Amino acid sequence: MPKVPETLAPRRTSRQIRVGKVLVGGDAPVSVQSMTTTPTTNINATLQQIAELTACGCDIVRVAVPNRDDAEVLPIIAKKSQIPVIADIHFQPNYVYAAIDAGCAAVRVNPGNIRKFDDQVGEIARRAKAADVSLRIGVNAGSLDRRLLEKYGKPTAEALVESAVWEASLFEEHDFHDFKISVKHNDPIVMVKAYRMLAERGDWPLHLGVTEAGPAFQGTIKSATAFGILLGEGIGDTIRVSLSAPPAEEVKVGLQILQSLNLRERKLEIVSCPSCGRAQVDVYKLAEDVTSGFEGMSVPLRVAVMGCVVNGPGEAREADLGVASGNGKGQIFVKGEVIKTVPESEIVATLIAEATRIAEDMADAGAPSPSGKPTVTVGR
């Protein structure tokens, strides 16, 4: 593998907290979160979705607790989940206490809509501390306190930060410090501004998120833009990509963002040209076929799928494994050396065979067993 480039900036120094078995902040890796979309009371469906999220690399999962029935099943969900569970609480402070008692790893509280929240802080802090449960102060543009909306006229970055800092100070007055903060907005520009301001105000670990980001394509672009800016500046300790899409897609996008910024080990990466009039092979289909064939592998390999002789040979030589196509044939490269030329119809099978061989060699040398799915990067 080529040497992994350095990150754009050193990580911001933040205090470290624990969310179950996952460390957040400090020198811990940036973690990826998602949220279940099933009714929490449907225990089997919720646990099945958590299992799917775990399998695709999710570190922490959040579940909704909109009513008493949801609160009552939290002990089962928390006990049987493979990854730490955060209870997402709005409106009812009693559900915060229920989540703490249920054994959830953490609780997200929304200071903008929990009844008389400031009056509840002392008791929440006491009980969370006794149970070794961390919190997230989750400030959201869509549910900002009325007083701040009147002061600023709308949910500005300044309003979000003022809310977060005020609530943080209340918890700290009660000697409770095991919390992270989020200041989410659906506008990436406002969101970035808010997190930059918040990062200057204290050493709290920060949970990044663009709220209500939208459908998969739009939400991916908005989240990648905002996260890329902040994480590139060293700001951010855990992320959640909010998409109107299956939760597993949120995790895949989040992991790809971290890998692209060298904040996670790069897994199987397929570099394919965007195609043009010079292409002598159907690059789109070839890249899709290679990706499908590599499903189930996540070894750290860079595989180049190139459609012509302009960038093809050079890009393929820079990859661990690659093909440069033309005239109905494909030159197969391994570590920069041409090992064979095969008919176009055999390109995919040959790449898969060589990738499998390399993966087996890595396993024999003590590398982790391949798992998960490859990612596709379209380049050039």
UniProtKB/Swiss-Prot annotation:
Biological process terms in GO annotation: isopentenyl diphosphate biosynthetic process, methylerythritol 4-phosphate pathway; terpenoid biosynthetic process
SUPFAM superfamilies noted in UniProt: Dihydropteroate synthetase-like (SSF51717), Nitrite and sulphite reductase 4Fe-4S domain-like (SSF56014)
EC number annotated for this UniProt entry: 1.17.7.3
Coiled-coil regions listed in the entry: none
Species, as recorded: Leifsonia xyli subsp. xyli (strain CTCB07)
Pathway stated in the Swiss-Prot or TrEMBL entry: Isoprenoid biosynthesis; isopentenyl diphosphate biosynthesis via DXP pathway; isopentenyl diphosphate from 1-deoxy-D-xylulose 5-phosphate: step 5/6
Molecular function as annotated in GO: 4 iron, 4 sulfur cluster binding; 4-hydroxy-3-methylbut-2-en-1-yl diphosphate synthase activity (ferredoxin); 4-hydroxy-3-methylbut-2-enyl-diphosphate synthase activity (flavodoxin); iron ion binding
Name listed for the protein in its UniProt record: 4-hydroxy-3-methylbut-2-en-1-yl diphosphate synthase (flavodoxin)
Keywords: 4Fe-4S, Iron, Iron-sulfur, Isoprene biosynthesis, Metal-binding, Oxidoreductase
Leader peptide range in chain numbering: none
Binding-site residues, [4Fe-4S] cluster: 273, 276, 308, 315
Domain of life (superkingdom): Bacteria
UniProt record similarity statement: Belongs to the IspG family.
Cofactor(s) named in the record: [4Fe-4S] cluster
Role summary: Converts 2C-methyl-D-erythritol 2,4-cyclodiphosphate (ME-2,4cPP) into 1-hydroxy-2-methyl-2-(E)-butenyl 4-diphosphate.
Reactions performed catalytically: (2E)-4-hydroxy-3-methylbut-2-enyl diphosphate + oxidized [flavodoxin] + H2O + 2 H(+) = 2-C-methyl-D-erythritol 2,4-cyclic diphosphate + reduced [flavodoxin]
Cofactor: how and how many bound: Binds 1 [4Fe-4S] cluster.
UniProt cross-references to InterPro entries, sorted A to Z: Dihydropteroate_synth-like_sf (IPR011005), IspG_bac (IPR016425), IspG_bac-typ (IPR004588), NO2/SO3_Rdtase_4Fe4S_sf (IPR045854)
